[in-house]
Amino acid sequence: MNISRRAILGVRRPRRRIAAAIVGLLAGCTFAFLLQLDTAMPPGGWELGVAVFAAGLVVAVYAGWARGGAFPGVGSVLLPLLWVAILPPVVAYLRGREYSGSRYSTIRLSDALHTTGTELELAIETVPYLLVGALLFGGAAFFVGAGARRLSGR
């Protein structure tokens, strides 16, 4: 494997750990969201969406530190961003108007009198902006991890 491919795709073992961490994180957060455990968080505590994004950034730093690859590092930020933007409207769309109140931990577009279908369409339209955000934040987090590894002498 040449050096540029290794930098982009990473080493196999850390790449698998990154994938397992993100899949586990999103699965756990999905269950917490569906069971409405995110509404039981203490006042002033982090909302579930912010916590998922922060965990994705931590995984991206780990990707840089463990030579997991830039692509898995950026992906570890993109997937939580997609989760935060798309899962609540999908749940609202599938359940109908049952969740039209202030149930969500993300900003509700239905507060601006959108239907659940329109809310889902608008969430899907934000995907290119989420990709740009993931490239910026995930890339920066990856380079922080890679720089920390280089500074530590490993």
How would you describe each model-predicted region?
Residues R12-A20, A32-A55, I124, Y129:
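Transmembrane alpha-helix entry/boundary detector in multi-pass membrane proteins
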Residues A54-Y62, L131-G145:
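Hydrophobic cores of alpha-helical transmembrane segments in multi-pass inner/ER membrane proteins
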Residues L26-L34, P80-A92:
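Aromatic-anchored segments of alpha-helical transmembrane domains
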Residues M1, I22-L26, A70-V84, H114-A140:
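Hydrophobic alpha-helical transmembrane segments
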Residues W83-A112:
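Juxtamembrane non-transmembrane "cap" segments at the membrane-aqueous interface
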Residues E47-L78:
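Canonical alpha-helical transmembrane segments
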Residues M1-F33, G147-R154:
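Haloarchaeal acidic low-complexity proteome signature biased toward cell-envelope/secretome components but also
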